[in-house]
């Protein structure tokens, strides 16, 4: 899965999360910070996104411990082939 495909998947899961919360959708870009308050998500929402990415890509970049990432683009690169 390319980085662009991963970004689209992140957007799709984020849309589902926000729809379930009744929060307006947010358009992502690679430079959007994940957990600084820019996105209206919490750590459980982020975990849901990560689990979905692991499922669709077959990758687990966190297998050996936490890998730091700050932006949506950095997260996408962790899962891109």
Predicted regions and their residues:
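Phosphopantetheine-dependent thiolation modules in NRPS/PKS and related acyl-activating systems
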Residues: 1-41, 45-51, 55-81
């Amino acid at each position: 899965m390319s980085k662009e495909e991963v970004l689209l998947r992140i957007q799709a899961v984020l849309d589902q999360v926000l729809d379930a919360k009744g929060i307006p959708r947010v358009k992502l870009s690679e430079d959007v910070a994940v957990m600084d308050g820019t996105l209206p998500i919490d750590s459980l929402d982020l975990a849901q996104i990560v689990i979905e990415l692991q499922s669709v890509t077959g990758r687990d970049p966190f297998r050996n411990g936490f890998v730091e990432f700050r932006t949506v683009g950095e997260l996408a690169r962790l899962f891109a082939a």
